């Protein structure tokens, strides 16, 4: 089981649960991006954590659990979100819409697979695409702004990159993914990631990282 705290940093949260984890004979590896638990009593540990922290923890083992925790967190903060995604092809939207009740916070998404859709619907500047390309921090920043233009939301997520197996370049080889999150009125947070694996694996890892970035912003 891997999870992270949404209302505090992982190191501080671990101090609160360390004694109980030892009692359950659970070993823990604490990192900035999450806490990984191992042991025979993971089921009991999960129940303990959910009882104690409710929606203030997010499991990172699968998209559905991550999205469910984020939806509850967004509800508590009275925030709505929409997305723009290219190489993930709708998987980011699906991570939210697979959860019953997501419509309370998830307003919709744009699968902007072509440059034309990025330009026409999201208003990504043609010069940005020509100078920096679709696989760039600059493109993702403008995709985020395009989300705010199309949806009445307080949060935006965007993904663009090379999922492979074809495509890519020396500057942006297959597996290079740019992921951005932005709160309305605040500066965008953009990560340049490199994921290994086949196309499906890279797409899934992109969605997982996007959900992680959203959790970090919240």
Describe each region flagged by the PLM:
Residues 1-24, 38, 42-218:
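Short alpha-helical segments enriched in small residues
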Residues 27:
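Short, surface-exposed charged micro-motifs
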Residues 30-34:
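Short Gly/Ser/Thr- and Asp/Glu-enriched loop/turn motifs at secondary-structure junctions
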């Amino acid at each position: 089981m891997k999870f992270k705290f949404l209302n505090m940093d992982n190191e501080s949260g671990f101090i609160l649960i360390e004694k109980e984890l030892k009692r359950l004979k659970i070993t823990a590896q604490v990192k900035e991006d999450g806490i990984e638990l191992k042991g025979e009593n993971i089921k009991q540990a999960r129940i303990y954590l959910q009882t104690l922290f409710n929606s203030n923890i997010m499991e990172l083992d699968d998209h559905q659990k991550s999205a469910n925790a984020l939806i509850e967190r967004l509800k508590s903060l009275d925030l709505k979100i929409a997305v723009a995604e290219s190489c993930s092809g709708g998987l980011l939207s699906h991570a939210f819409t697979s959860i019953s009740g997501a419509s309370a916070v998830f307003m919709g998404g744009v699968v902007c697979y072509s440059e034309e859709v990025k330009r026409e619907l999201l208003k990504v500047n043609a010069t940005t695409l020509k100078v920096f390309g679709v696989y760039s921090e600059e493109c993702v920043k403008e995709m985020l702004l395009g989300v705010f233009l199309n949806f009445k939301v307080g949060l935006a997520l965007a993904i663009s990159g090379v999922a492979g197996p074809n495509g890519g370049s020396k500057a942006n080889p297959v597996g290079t993914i740019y992921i951005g999150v932005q709160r309305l009125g605040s500066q965008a947070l953009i990560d340049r990631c490199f994921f290994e694996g086949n196309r499906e694996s890279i797409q899934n890892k992109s969605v997982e990282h996007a959900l992680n970035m959203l959790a970090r912003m919240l």
